A protein has these predicted regions:
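Catalytic domains that recognize anionic headgroups
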Residues: 2-526
Length: 526
């Protein structure tokens, strides 16, 4: 039996896809489709941005933030000590997509790109026998995805699932989102153009607009526009319609759109889908509004950190938890849609995040030098075809493990550049025993050069060590070292570095040795 898709088959399938999504790439996809084998399993990777495992009830959080996912967990492998490779989108996403750590792929600056050596070393090139499709709400994730576009059959533009005039109430004026202006005018340079637009016109949390006159006018106009033009949607979201830093969206619109698209996508496919929630601003659906207000939950009180500036962030923490409820519901709907359309029978689903979120020690968010658990420990759940029971894995795992694991379980050829391992239960537990897992925060460094200002974390067994160096807050030549037993002290309140010197020194030496190895190519030999 010939299992290869012919040109005739491909054209039939192409006709089923929405032309706005498929047309730009179809003619260049014939060679790739010729490689597709119909008896290979599909892969879907779902990333919800800034989603901390610390805030997930499935992992023991006191607030019930994930009731739907908890039910689905009976059909999944649940990883309890899974770590992002960085603490914001660029390094965290790049490690998922390349299977390498930030000090290797070098995408550790805000909005940065992977080093040229990794442009052809990515999830999509590794799954060359699959139809490859992707979408992201997140601009920085899209910058990376566009680097890998030559290895994609379908790249869905960022603006596809943001609100436009077609979603608005009738006859109330006209407005184009930043995404759609850029997509229409600068399709081939969308990422660069959108960053330029933002800097010129938008005054947001990541910086200041270049135009001090136009920016306030634009922001005020957009605010008033959204209050009237999207009145129907606004009624569903008491804290405002969900948005990234620049434009509005509905998560259910992206979930429904991608879910519908996958039903008609050529199989086997490999899809990477990166959604904005529960990243700030925390604009949950009215069904979950004030669900946790005055519920009596009081998080542990922790000291203000050297890099912190305020006290407890209880209000925003509560709103973040309520936003997770929205994520939980929408993933449940997405899973049910795949089930109803028969895709669960031959599809691996990975549910994870690029980094976490922090509401303690005077710090809110994730762009911070600290690497405490809430900002680096993220969910990982793998739903494999036909699974009917739950498996819990407590070994330390990393974002860089996803690529080799998914290649293994789908019978694809392994790649030489991946820095992760094949995860249990799909391989022997020996692959993760006694291994060290690393997290890298190095955004203040040049992409091509040694790391001289950074925070590095290493997790081995029950212990986690954080090593801070180069920050001006530490003084000239200063460094800061913290050691925690995560099993005994999950809140990281008791620094053991001065009392468990042997373990601390062993982990610090391992971390410094790895840093020396990764810095070596960038140090002058003269």
């Amino acid at each position: 039996m010939n299992n290869r898709i012919t040109r005739r088959d491909f054209l039939k399938l192409a006709g089923l896809l929405p032309i706005s999504v498929a047309a730009p790439r179809f003619l260049g996809s014939l060679d790739a489709l010729g490689r597709v084998q119909v008896n290979t399993q599909n892969v879907i990777v779902i990333v919800f941005d800034a989603w901390s495992a610390y805030h997930i009830s499935l992992y023991g959080y006191q607030r019930e933030t994930t009731p739907n996912i908890a039910k689905l967990a009976d059909q999944a492998v649940i990883y309890h000590n899974h770590y992002a490779s960085g603490n914001f989108t660029t390094p965290g996403t790049a490690s998922i997509l390349t299977g390498a750590l930030p000090w290797s792929h070098r995408a550790f600056q805000p909005g940065g790109k992977v080093d040229e050596a990794f442009v052809e070393k990515n999830f999509f090139s590794a799954f060359k026998n699959h139809y490859r499709i992707t979408y992201s709400h997140n601009l920085w994730a899209n910058i990376l995805l566009r680097q890998f576009r030559d290895d994609l059959e379908t790249y869905i533009p960022k603006g596809k699932y943001f609100l436009t005039e077609e979603d608005a109430d009738s006859n109330r004026g006209f407005f184009l989102s930043s995404n759609n202006i850029i997509q229409d005018l600068f399709g081939n340079d969308e990422d660069i153009a959108l960053v330029s637009w933002i800097r010129a016109m938008e005054n947001e949390q990541e910086g200041y607009a270049y135009s001090l006159f136009l920016s306030p006018l634009y922001e005020e106009y957009k605010k008033r526009y959204n209050e009237t033009r999207f009145a129907e949607q606004k009624a569903l979201f008491p804290r405002g319609i969900p948005r990234d830093d620049y434009d509005n969206f509905l998560l259910e619109q992206a979930i429904d759109g991608i879910g519908g698209l996958l039903v008609t996508t050529p199989q086997p496919f490999m899809g990477y889908f990166h959604f904005w929630p529960p990243h700030a601003p925390y604009s949950t659906h009215r069904d979950f509004y004030r669900r946790f207000y005055e519920d009596g939950y009081n998080p542990p009180v922790k000291p203000i950190d050297l890099f912190g500036d305020e006290g407890p962030k209880t209000k925003n923490r509560t709103e973040y938890d309520e936003y997770i409820l929205y994520v939980d519901r929408e993933f449940g709907r997405f899973y049910d849609h795949l089930d109803e359309n028969g895709l669960l029978e031959n599809t691996w689903i990975v549910l994870t995040s690029d980094h976490g979120e922090l509401f303690e020690r005077g710090i809110e968010g994730h762009r911070t030098p600290v690497l405490y658990e809430p900002v680096v420990r993220v969910p990982l759940m793998i739903f494999d075809p036909g699974r009917e029971s739950r498996t819990d894995v407590y070994a330390n795992t990393s974002a860089v493990d996803l690529l080799p694991t998914l290649l293994h379980v789908t019978g694809q050829k392994q790649i030489e550049w991946a820095e992760g391992v094949i995860l249990p239960p799909f391989a022997s537990d020996e692959t993760v025993q006694d291994r060290s897992v690393f997290v890298v925060q190095a955004e203040k460094n040049e992409q091509i050069g040694p790391l001289t200002i950074a925070t590095l974390a290493i997790r081995n067994g029950d212990y986690k060590l954080m090593y801070f160096f180069g920050y001006e807050e530490l003084g000239t030549g200063g460094e800061r070292i913290e050691l925690y037993n995560i099993k005994d002290d999950p809140e990281e309140l008791n620094n053991l570095y001065d009392t468990e010197k042997e373990i601390g020194q062993e982990l610090l030496n391992a971390l410094k040795a790895k840093l020396k190895e990764m810095n070596a190519p960038y140090l002058s030999t003269s």
